[in-house]
């Protein structure tokens, strides 16, 4: 009888561990944004700016990371901001103060928005040609 109770307790512990892992994976899979950066801090406390959170509660940090309490396992966080990655060399990315929004501006004058000017075929998606242009021929 004692052995049966011990096995039941071990099985419950294993099942609880799998539930936690499934919760962590599902939270990260449900997060919007395909190119989001996510990380997990094992055994991290669930508090931010003096406020404590319980299992499943979440908060948005000032650096635009959305974090979820996975107590007692830790904290999982994903970047919610969409960062531009392919833009003309004469432009730069600026984060708007106090928001999770980004703007493309001219390096020469950050007050002016970036001028597109078409794709840069040397800096893009595997040197793919612009729509309507002929594909490069390999020799």
Curated annotation (Swiss-Prot):
Belongs to the beta-microseminoprotein family. Residues 116-139 are annotated as: Disordered. Disulfide bonds join 38-78, 46-69, 64-100, 67-77, 91-114. GO terms for cellular component: cytoplasm; extracellular space. This is Prostate-associated microseminoprotein. Pfam families: PSP94. One of its GO terms (biological process) is inflammatory response. Gene3D superfamilies: Beta-microseminoprotein (PSP94) domain. Residues 1-35 form the signal peptide. It is found in: Secreted. Keywords: Chemotaxis, Cytokine, Disulfide bond, Inflammatory response, Secreted, Signal. Acts as a ligand for C-C chemokine receptor CCR2. Signals through binding and activation of CCR2 and induces a strong chemotactic response and mobilization of intracellular calcium ions. Exhibits a chemotactic activity for monocytes and lymphocytes but not neutrophils. GO terms for molecular function: CCR2 chemokine receptor binding; cytokine activity.
């Amino acid at each position: 009888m004692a052995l049966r109770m011990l096995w039941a307790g071990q099985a419950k512990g294993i099942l609880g561990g799998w539930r936690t892992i499934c919760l962590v994976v599902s939270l990260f899979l449900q997060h919007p944004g395909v190119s989001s950066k996510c990380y997990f801090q094992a055994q991290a406390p669930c508090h931010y700016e003096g406020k404590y959170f319980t299992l499943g509660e979440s908060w948005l940090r000032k650096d635009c990371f959305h974090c979820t309490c996975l107590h007692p396992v830790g904290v999982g966080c994903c970047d919610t901001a969409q960062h531009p990655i392919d833009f003309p060399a004469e432009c730069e990315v600026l984060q708007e103060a106090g928001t999770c929004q980004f703007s493309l501006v001219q390096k020469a004058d950050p007050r002016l928005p970036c001028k597109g000017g078409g794709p840069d075929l040397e800096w893009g998606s595997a040197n793919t040609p612009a729509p309507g242009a002929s594909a490069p021929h390999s020799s």
